[in-house]
A protein has these predicted regions:
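Alpha-helical scaffold elements adjacent to nucleotide-binding pockets in ATP/GTP-utilizing enzyme cores
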Residues: 105-108, 138-142
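Short glycine-/polar-rich loops that comprise or flank the Walker A/P-loop
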Residues: 93-95, 118-119, 382-383
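Nucleic-acid-processing active sites and adjacent nucleic-acid-binding tracks
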Residues: 62-97, 228
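Acidic beta-strand-to-loop metal/phosphate-binding motif
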Residues: 30, 95-102, 387
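Conserved beta-strand -> loop -> alpha-helix junction used to position metal-binding or nucleic-acid-contacting
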Residues: 115-132, 138-141
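Conserved "right-hand" nucleotidyltransferase catalytic core of DNA-directed polymerases
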Residues: 1-71, 134, 144-147, 155-373, ...
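Phosphate- and divalent-cation-binding pockets in alpha/beta enzyme and binding domains
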Residues: 104-111, 271-272
Length: 397
């Protein structure tokens, strides 16, 4: 915990709320949580891994906004039990609950042991429906473009600099007085953005697709919370098999060329070709350097080049895929991030579901080695898994 006086050079006019208002009369409530999420950049949200915490809750309605700090390391914090009791009442209302990147906040709300009633609106998802060609979907960018409002970050960044912390990932280390105004502003902007998006939904006749995405959301949330079951013993066995395969193929190469090449370095494979009197490989147009594609190595008549390709496959599966899987396993499960639509953290323009942390689209196909990797994913007890392949075509103009 950072030890530092609260009375530094940076001043704040934010005042901590002195009451818990009854919001039951409001039809729309905007919510933004500030969190301590230490592994966010490397493993995704910590909400499913029993680390981190919600440090503050910002709520906004038509004529009021407030930020309730409960776990800032530098304080001051309000009574956690009282705040969560009030927040629970807010969530139990039938009003629309409006978020930007809703699944992130909803996961942390679940972590608090609270339940959300009413329809959940995600302005980041709506932004993608309104304009799928945007480059950025973060709250600041979208709000600036649609309502001319942006985050109030100047005081926060100045305070973070004085305290020697990252203004985003280490916000929880700052005193609440430097975060309160920023957090309230986020909730207010999200609410205002939703008012503008309602106009866009009407003008573009997007009601059906917006409603569809809202209906899908609870299922995606449950999928994220439940996670995918992993057989960790099988993962270790597959990892060992891949290592043995890699060693076997590299030994074969060494026996034929008398050295271990760097299988991902074209210059090193070129030396193998020199030893084997192979000259039919391509060179890049710009630099003239050798190029060794997977297709070239896999289908070459020379067994050494085919062995290099096989070694590459084993190496990639082990170091790129399995190591990534191991990094995300928690209590025998992987809780990958699921993306409904294109957004700042991943996703596709077409609306096809995609994953990150880890990227489950990287699961190998139905080769022998690929099926070995797929075997680490196991169904729930009493459930059978059916493997289906859907043939489809994406038409472009």
């Amino acid at each position: 915990m950072i030890q530092k006086t609260l009375f530094g050079k940076v001043q704040s006019e934010w005042v901590q709320p002195d009451h818990f208002p009854d919001l039951s009369k409001y039809d729309e409530i905007s919510i933004d949580l500030e969190t301590k999420d230490p592994d966010l950049k490397t493993k995704g949200s910590s909400s499913t891994r029993d680390v981190g915490d919600v440090v503050g809750i910002a709520v906004a309605v038509k004529d009021w906004a407030g930020y309730y700090p409960i776990a800032h390391e530098a304080g001051p914090n309000m009574n956690r039990k009282q705040v969560l009791a009030w927040f629970s009442d807010v969530l139990k209302t039938d009003s629309l609950k409006i978020f930007h990147n809703a699944i992130y906040d909803m996961l942390w709300i679940h972590r608090l042991g609270l339940t959300v009633h009413g329809t959940v609106v995600d302005t980041m998802v709506v932004a993608s429906l309104v304009d799928e060609n945007r480059f950025r979907y973060d709250l600041n960018s979208v709000a600036n473009d649609y309502i001319g409002m942006g985050k109030n970050e100047s005081a926060l960044q100045e305070a973070a600099k004085e305290w020697g912390v990252d203004p985003k990932s280490e916000m929880y280390k700052l005193p609440a007085m430097y975060v309160g105004e920023y957090a309230e502003r986020d909730a207010e902007i999200t609410l205002s953005l939703w008012q503008e998006f309602k106009k866009e939904i009407n003008s573009q006749d997007l009601h059906a697709i917006v409603e569809l995405e809202q209906q899908v959301f609870p299922c995606l949330l449950e999928m994220k919370l439940k996670g995918v079951r992993i057989d960790e013993d099988q993962l270790t066995r597959v990892e060992n098999t891949l290592q043995k395969n890699y060693d076997k193929y590299m030994k074969r190469v060494k026996e034929d060329v008398d050295f271990y090449p760097e299988i991902w370095a074209a210059a090193s494979i070129e030396k193998v070709c020199q030893v084997r009197n192979i000259t039919d490989f391509d060179r890049t147009p710009k630099t003239g350097k050798p190029s060794f594609t997977k297709n070239y190595l896999k289908n070459h008549k020379d067994p050494v080049l085919r062995a290099i390709n096989s070694a590459r496959e084993a190496d990639k599966l082990k170091n790129t895929f399995l190591d990534s899987i191991k990094n995300f396993v928690h209590n025998g499960r992987i809780h990958a991030d699921i993306h409904q639509l294109k957004g700042d953290f991943g996703g596709t323009v077409t609306g096809r579901l995609s994953y990150s942390n880890p990227n489950l689209q990287q699961i190998p196909n139905y080769t022998d080695i690929g099926m070995g990797v797929r075997s680490i994913f196991v169904p729930e007890k009493g459930i059978d898994v059916v493997v289906l392949t859907i043939l489809n075509k994406n038409l472009g103009w």
